[in-house]
């Protein structure tokens, strides 16, 4: 599959963005650090058509080296984030995943595992789900839709059934069950140019459809497709980049600015570079800071 370099992606976005001053306005970071997000590499047991990090089974060479893992462990102690967010690829495939989880939990940090669900069924990771429950890791599980057809179309044949099997496994361990304290959030990420408009009726449909298949969850959230990586390439091939950016512009909600992830998050790449968010990480727009030495004073109030 062809791919676009970060430089090519930035150029395409720049040439297709609406010519408005609002796109040049800066934001200011909040004080402190709420989320330390660690991208452990693009290795994944799946290869989804919409993936904004170009993850797949052929990405073992992108895994975070142990020297950077150690810097992440040290940064947890120095920065004292409220939440450590582990992402990838499939972060669980990194050999230091459990070490990072244990260290974060020992410091009192909440931990989120951004999980594709099917990774929980790999024979080599048979004890992974019990480990997550034991460490009380919060799971944000990606599932395009509660129906089989659209899920398989985006993620491959058989992935819907495998995802349901993994969800039932998590339910048996207490995830998604009232009063257990084990949080299971489903994240819907539809393919193509469709924008998420999750309503209370949508959540009712999700709960009813999945309950009929023996699955329960705590929360449902939605994510729209960022026009980068594989999705940007698809838009370019269909000559739809400008139209999609205009659609995003039309859906802009100014009330969302105060809660943007870049204002309270520090994103770390597998190579140890620092970014405001993982989307900027994929576009190679780093911060002028070093993981080994960054402190809270470097982050608070900084312009984005």
Which residues fall in each region the model found?
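Short loop/turn motifs at secondary-structure junctions
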Residues: 47, 80, 135-136, 180-183, ...
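A broadly conserved sequence feature marking short terminus-proximal activation segments
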Residues: 1-20, 264, 271-290
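Short, surface-exposed charged micro-motifs
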Residues: 39, 265-267
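Conserved strand-to-helix beginnings and helix N-cap segments that scaffold or border functional pockets
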Residues: 94-98, 125-126, 196-200
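C-terminal accessory region of radical SAM enzymes
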Residues: 216-248, 266, 273-275, 279-304
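Radical SAM enzyme [4Fe-4S]-AdoMet core and its adjacent flexible, acidic
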Residues: 147-261
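Core AdoMet radical
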Residues: 35, 55-64, 79-94, 105-124, ...
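Conserved alpha-helical substructure of the radical SAM core
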Residues: 4-88, 92-106
């Amino acid at each position: 599959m062809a791919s676009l370099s970060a430089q090519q992606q930035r150029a395409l976005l720049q040439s297709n963005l609406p010519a408005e001053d609002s796109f040049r306005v800066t934001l200011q970071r909040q004080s402190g650090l709420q989320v330390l997000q660690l991208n452990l590499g693009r290795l994944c047991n799946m290869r989804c058509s919409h993936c904004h990090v170009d993850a797949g089974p052929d990405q073992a060479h992108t895994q975070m080296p142990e020297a950077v893992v150690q810097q992440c462990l040290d940064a947890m102690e120095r920065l004292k984030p409220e939440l450590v967010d582990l992402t990838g690829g499939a972060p669980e495939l990194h050999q230091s995943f459990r070490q990072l989880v244990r260290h974060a939990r020992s410091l009192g940090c909440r931990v989120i595992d951004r999980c594709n669900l099917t990774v929980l069924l790999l024979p080599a990771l048979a004890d992974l789900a019990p480990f997550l429950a034991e460490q009380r890791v919060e799971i944000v599980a990606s599932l395009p839709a509660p129906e089989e057809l659209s899920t398989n179309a985006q993620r491959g044949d058989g992935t819907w059934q495998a995802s349901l099997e993994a969800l039932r496994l998590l339910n048996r361990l207490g995830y998604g069950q009232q009063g257990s304290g084990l949080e299971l959030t489903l994240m819907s990420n539809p393919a193509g140019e469709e924008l998420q408009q999750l309503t209370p009726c949508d959540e009712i449909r999700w709960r009813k459809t999945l309950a009929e298949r023996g699955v329960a969850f705590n929360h449902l959230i939605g994510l729209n497709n960022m026009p980068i990586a594989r999705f940007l390439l698809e838009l370019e091939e269909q000559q739809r980049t400008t139209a999609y950016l205009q659609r995003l512009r039309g859906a802009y909600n100014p009330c969302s600015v105060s809660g943007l992830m870049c204002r309270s998050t520090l994103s770390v790449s597998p190579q140890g570079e620092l970014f405001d968010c993982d989307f900027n990480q994929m576009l190679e727009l780093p911060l002028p800071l070093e993981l080994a030495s960054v402190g809270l004073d470097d982050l608070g109030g900084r312009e984005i």
